[in-house]
Amino acid sequence: SEAVAAYYVSIAGGDLHADKSNGSNNHDIKKKLRSIQAVVYDQYHYHGNYDHYEELENADLCSVIERRKGMPISLSIICMYVAKAQGWNIVGIGLPGHFICRLEANGERIIFDPFHHANIVNAVDLRRLLKLALGSEAELKPEHYQAISNRKTLLRLQNNIKQRQVDKHNFLDAIITLDTMRKIAPDEAELLLDAGQLYAQAKQPRAAINALSRYLDHSPSQYGRTKASVLIQQMKRQLD
């Protein structure tokens, strides 16, 4: 509602109606970040679930909202929702092994980490996060901190759920999650390869063959096509 929006903007030190009439934001970018911190973390007490990071609930938005704790990407989505409700320019950044946000206003940019109370992240922090995920030899490149689309953000969130289900050998649940991912990105051929592999792990060779055959019809990846062809032959032998 407008009352809620006015409350958020007031924390940032601004005027809701002035923003709308001018079509631009005149608030200091750090005040915007402080307003996100005040609302998401101080008022509603969201926080990163450091102690039980691998819990499936950390990637389930309904559970995150109920428990007020989650993983980097789920908390990033909460922060992005709050900022976008005010018309602020915010995007998600999918670092390998971590997820952060970038806020922009009046030509200034701030990168912050929703998993750690929306603290500002600098180049040194980015390198450290990258090396934690990819090893000490990894070097920070521009593609590592490029903004990703809302669709890719949702896919990454669902992939976190799927991976946790696979780790627990809940292959049928993982297939359901993957079906959701395919609805989000129906043209993403790699999801058919993932589906084929999951069906194979779930002891459903016919479904695996069907998904992998469809993958072969759509994928240009020679490596993926070879992998799919080998798995199809394995599934056919199970049916013999």
Please provide the spans of the model-predicted regions:
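A structural boundary/capping signal
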Residues: 1-240
